[in-house]
């Protein structure tokens, strides 16, 4: 799998065998927490689609997911994500089903129905405690 940082607010995930790599379009670009969130969303979507394709006996070697996002304020955060599924070999009559399958990604569902967050400050460990 290869994650490519396309811009400060866009990534691309390509499937494939071998180790996962993270690449950038330029040396100045760094893998930000926003890229990480989008990578999780794209990887989950790619995984769900690959599993469906295997089950349906469809080739998925050319499947890729791009995720873009934009920010909103008060407070500053990601306001929306746009997922673009690129799958040139997918037959036209399977596109609607593939889109439904993509919507089953657990990461996407978690974002749509956010969990409760709890932040705790833990006490420092006692000196000499083992």
Walk through the language-model features, giving the residues of each:
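Extended beta-strand/beta-hairpin segments
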Residues: 1-39, 49-130
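Alpha-helical metal-binding/catalytic segments enriched in His/Glu/Asp
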Residues: 44-45
